[in-house]
Structures are given as C-alpha cells and as structure tokens.
UniProtKB/Swiss-Prot annotation:
Residues 10-89 form the TFIIS N-terminal domain. SUPFAM superfamilies: Conserved domain common to transcription factors TFIIS, elongin A, CRSP70, Elongation factor TFIIS domain 2, Zinc beta-ribbon. A zinc finger (TFIIS-type) spans 336-376. Expressed in roots, leaves and flowers. InterPro entries: TF_IIS-typ, TFIIS/CRSP70_N_sub, TFIIS/LEDGF_dom_sf, TFIIS_cen_dom, TFIIS_cen_dom_sf, TFIIS_N, TFSII, Znf_TFIIS. This is Transcription elongation factor TFIIS. SMART domains: TFS2M, TFS2N, ZnF_C2C2. The modification N-acetylmethionine is found at M1. PROSITE patterns: TFIIS_CENTRAL, TFIIS_N, ZF_TFIIS_1, ZF_TFIIS_2. It is found in: Nucleus.
Length: 378
C-alpha cells in the first residue's frame, strides 16, 4: 500500500517538474498526466501512519506552490483532504485514550435468592484471649438437621503514642516510613528515553554579549517553527529543543567561522538572515528537527539555504535567461561534411552569415564538437 502511494506521487511529481521546466501554462500532456495522478491520489485510501511513513505530505507542499494553476489547485485540494484525515485520526486516538483512562472495572453482580422460610440460628460467643474471639453458630435446616460452625473474629491491636513514639500492643515501637518529595516526584514522573537529552529550561550563556545576542536571535527564530508546522510535523517539532539547537548552532559557528565581526561576517549574516526570514519556514524546521545538522548548515550556500519556493523561482529565472541568451544566436546545424584540421574528426556544427555584398557567397562558420576548434570559409 505504501509503495503504491509513493509510485503514484512520484509519477505526479515528475510530470509537474516537466511541466514547470517546459513553461507550460495550462495545457499539455505533462499537466494532464500530473492532474490524473493527483486525482487518483484523492481516491487512494490513506491513514495517519501511512502519511508519516511515506512523508508524501511534506513533498506535496511543493506541488501546492506550482506555477501551473490547474496543478496548484488540485494539489491544494488533496493536501486539505490529507490534513482532515490526520486531524480526524488524531482526535479519535485522543478520545480513545481518554475513554480507556476513565473506564472503571465492572463488577458482575450476582442475584441472591432469599429463602422463603429462614431457619432459626443460635449464636454463642466463646472468649479466647484478648486478640481473638470465637463465635459458635448453630443453624437448623428445614429437614430438622442442625449445622454447627465456628466463626473467629480478631481484634485490631491498639497502638498507643508515648512521647511522640507509637507503641503497639506487644510493647514494641512502630516506625513511620515517610517517602520524600523527591522520591514521590520521581515515582510519578514517566520514564524518559535514555538517548533523549532533557530539554533546557533556560538558554546557556557564554558571558559574551555578541554571542549571547546571536543565541537569542536563533532561539527566537527556532521557536516560531511550532506555530508554522503542520499537523503531521507537530510531533517531531514538539520533541525538539530549540534552546539546545540554538546553542549548538552558535557554538559550531563560533568554532568554525570565528567571531561574527571577523572575516566570516558575510557568512554569519547569510545564515542569520535565512533562518529569520519569514518566507523561509522550511530551513528553520529542518534545522530544528535535525534534518540539517549544524555542521551542514555552515557549509550551505545562500542558494541552498533558500526556501523551496525561492529555489523554484530561481530555477525558472535561470531557464528563462538561458533561453533568451540562446535565442539571439544564429541557428546551428550538425554535419559530417567538414573535417577538423586539429583533431581530424568530422563531428561539426556550422552556420552561415552574409558578411559581404548580396551577390557574394555567404561566409560559413564551422565549430568542431570534439575539440571546439573554430574556422570559417567562403
């Protein structure tokens, strides 16, 4: 089931990428193929566990920002459907847990039939010391049989208090065992995972005003992730510690890049700007959850730290610039009729231009594909 879901989504993703590269606006085979795959995903039965295991929900957000409006609208509808599934299953799970916690053990009641003619019962008390007392019970059955039994009752020994010390009936002191508050709290607290460090309650300072300010800015940026995360990301975000991550990032930046006022000032500014950018929630979330480690963060370029939306816009700008650049060049054709004088190969491209008067032959410009040798002739 998970593999089928991944295959369907990968097909839609490839078609959407092809449509974005080709610059298709609303029609085309890639757009139709992507929309058909997304409609199949709408009918595909998914659960919260399936979405978490395959992580297709995170990848679907890029299609919800696609430049083609048809793909964008269908992907947005599919994302809303999956969000409803996650919310409903989470609510059911919480309701089930609450029901199980409040459920009390049921006691089966047995009906007792009262005898119509109760038989007379004789009770005789027999004393046996101070600590116990026996009672002789005689009951006469309807068939004139007498049933005799002995019931023993024990007295609860009295405990006397003398000068703050409790003394039982045997004259021995009774010790009160008290549980300290620390032990009580440790007994009540649930056991934490051994490999998960506890969350910091306050930011660790290093007695350097500049470094402490950078840590405060990082904590402020990472704490915003909790309000930006989706429902299926909230569990991993809540398990992360923004204070500890901020301290780790700043410490590694200081260790590898030096002070923020030194030679790596621009690198500091680039990292801080992208982490605090309101349009770049993806980078903050990946750093907080550990998808991007502090070691990897300081090696990323400004383009790598950009948001998914910004990366897509940059790719479109590059494609358009490359297309505009090549549009002004002369059209070239491939041929094997020319032999390169440098490498002897016949893999060449050529184009012709009118460089002299109209009644003169055109000038042919040839380029060797193998060694990039250029020559011309008339």
């Amino acid at each position: 089931m998970e593999s089928d879901l991944i295959d369907l989504f990968e097909g839609a993703k490839k078609a959407a990428d092809a449509a974005a590269l080709d610059g298709v606006t609303s029609s085309g085979p890639e757009v139709s193929q992507c929309i058909d795959a997304l409609k199949q995903l709408k009918k595909f039965p998914v659960t919260y566990d399936t979405l978490v295991a395959t992580q297709v929900g995170k990848k679907l957000r890029s299609l919800a920002k696609h430049p083609v409006e048809d793909i964008k609208s269908v992907a947005t509808d599919l994302l809303e459907i999956w969000k409803k599934v996650v919310i409903e299953e989470t609510a059911k799970a919480k309701k089930t847990e609450g029901t199980n916690g409040c459920k009390e053990a049921k006691v089966n009641k047995m009906d007792v039939e009262k005898p119509s003619n109760p038989a007379p019962v004789k009770v005789q008390k027999l004393q046996r010391g101070d600590s116990a007392k026996s009672i002789k019970v005689e009951r006469k059955e309807p068939d004139n049989k007498v049933v005799t039994g002995v019931k023993i009752e024990r007295k609860v020994p009295d405990i006397k208090v003398t000068n703050g010390t409790k003394i039982d009936y045997r004259g021995q002191a009774v010790k009160d065992e008290k549980v300290s508050k620390d032990n009580q709290s440790s007994m009540k607290a649930p056991a934490k995972a051994a490999n998960a460090p506890p969350k910091l309650t306050a930011m660790l300072k290093c007695n350097d005003p500049v470094r402490d300010k950078i840590r405060e800015l990082l904590v402020e940026a990472l704490c915003r992730v909790a309000g930006e995360a989706d429902d299926y990301e909230r569990e991993s975000v809540n398990a992360s510690d923004p204070l500890r991550v901020a301290v780790s990032v700043e410490s590694l930046m200081f260790e590898k890049l030096g002070r923020s006022t030194g030679a790596q000032k621009l690198k500091y500014r680039s990292i801080m700007f992208n982490l605090r950018d309101s349009n770049n929630p993806d980078l903050r979330r990946r750093v907080l959850t550990g998808e991007i480690s502090p070691e990897k963060l300081i090696t990323l370029s400004a383009e790598d730290m950009a948001s998914d939306k910004r990366k897509q816009e940059n790719n479109q700008i590059k494609e358009k610039a490359l297309f505009d650049c090549e549009r002004g060049l002369a059209a070239k054709a491939s041929t094997d009729q020319f032999k390169c004088g440098r490498c002897g190969q016949r893999k060449c491209t050529y184009y012709q231009m009118q460089t002299r008067s109209a009644d003169e032959p055109m000038t042919t410009y040839v380029t060797c594909v193998n060694c990039d040798n250029h020559w011309k002739f008339c």
